[in-house]
């Protein structure tokens, strides 16, 4: 995408670039199936490439830019092409986030509904950053649950730190949860959070505590980039 202020080195992808990237995604899915994986997830959040297509950074004027459905066409294309190559039994998940990274919240909901109606995905995974966060008095969680999922399972992520919170999410209609921070801080998080009195470690944490949980030095160094996570 072009249009990012202050980065003259950024150029808009050509249509040939997009075809090449789509082929790479599809080939990765094909290899995953050959290696015994049950499915793949297309990551359309956190500022990654597919997220940039959905965001306001996308200033394209061709079929991959303009309205939100055009911006998201690359994701629809990928779902269809992976389904064709890998078959009906191969699981395809898409991760989206309704905010941050230059995303327009209402646009994301419109695209998500379009994707669900399309009927080709097996899971929609919402990265909410904080499942309890409210906007104008309404939780983001309740907003994503207003969509019609057409029977598609839904999962959420975002500061899920206890068995009690997981139980509440299930009661709200969530089918499964995605654990990030909790699993980084506790390698056995699902088992640990069932113990009476369990609480997730407060941030920041020491690098040694992360090594104890089995994280590599490379990953710990990566986590140092997250403000307030690793105590130096």
Which positions does each model-derived feature cover?
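Flavin-dependent oxidoreductase catalytic cores
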Residues: 1-232
